Amino acid sequence: MVRPKKKPVLGKDGKPLSAAAAKLRLLKRLKCTTKYEKLAADSGAKLIAGIDEVGRGALFGPVVAAAVILDPNYRIKGLRDSKLLPAETREILSKRIREHCIAWSIAAVDVARIDQLNIYWASNLAMKHAVRGLSCQPDHLLIDAMKLDLDCAQTPIIHGDALSASIAAASIIAKVHRDALIREWAPIFPEYDLASNKGYSAPKHIKALREFGPSPLHRQSFAPVWMASAPQEVLEFMLEETADTAVPPEVLED
């Protein structure tokens, strides 16, 4: 049976949006609330942690995860998926989250481990390390679309960072931390334009990989990295693919 082809999502100009841009539009329409936290509390949970990771799709640098237990008696306004927030707002919220939450923890898995395990299991590992790093252990986990091998009640939520305040808080402090790491490395590896692309796939990044080869902090198991020395026609195909899947510029802004 042949499945009907999905209709493309169109932008304001009537042209089809890339997959990444279409997802970003969807996320903007979702409402971030404490609905899932309240459901967990109603089931008897006292310490509810939100967990998320950032950098999963990047070509360069670690994958970073965070776990946050928000104080249910202190509301932090403006929490939403970190991809939807300007960098300055993320910085302000990250500080506020760390100051007013019950507990928070950040963990990173480096490129060597990513290449050894694959990015799915490396992300999973980073999340587990983040949970274990909390100063008090939670009795319920809210996780962005993943389950962890931990002895704790869990609720995986698709688009959780756009729907759950706790997961959104985790996504914010994880992104602020990872972006700070990238800022430190950008002057060391200026040829890859890391200040602009944050280590993600982008046409200038792909071209730099072809011209200079990968750095020690690139993920050698990722196709755009190990294919950097591919023939020109393959590179052109990769650039076309990148144009559709690259993270929209507003997500990467400083």
UniProtKB/Swiss-Prot annotation:
A Pfam family that the UniProt record links to this protein: RNase_HII
Cellular compartments annotated: Cytoplasm
Cofactor(s) required, per the database record: Mn(2+); Mg(2+)
GO BP terms, alphabetized: DNA replication, removal of RNA primer; mismatch repair
EC class name: hydrolase
Reactions that this protein is recorded to catalyse: Endonucleolytic cleavage to 5'-phosphomonoester
InterPro entries noted in UniProt: RNase_HII, RNase_HII/HIII, RNase_HII/HIII_dom, RNaseH-like_sf, RNaseH_sf
A GO-annotated cellular component: ribonuclease H2 complex
Major location category of this protein: cytoplasm
Annotated residues for binding of a divalent metal cation: 52-53, 144
Record's cofactor remark: Manganese or magnesium. Binds 1 divalent metal ion per monomer in the absence of substrate. May bind a second metal ion after substrate binding.
RNase H type-2 domain span: 46-234
E.C. number: 3.1.26.4
One MF term in the entry's GO annotations: RNA-DNA hybrid ribonuclease activity
SUPFAM superfamilies xref list: Ribonuclease H-like
Disulphide connectivity of cysteines: none
Key words of the record: Cytoplasm, Endonuclease, Hydrolase, Manganese, Metal-binding, Nuclease
Family: Belongs to the RNase HII family.
Task performed by this protein: Endonuclease that specifically degrades the RNA of RNA-DNA hybrids.
HAMAP family referenced in this protein's UniProt entry, alphabetically: RNase_HII_B (MF_00052_B)
Name of the protein in its database record: Ribonuclease HII
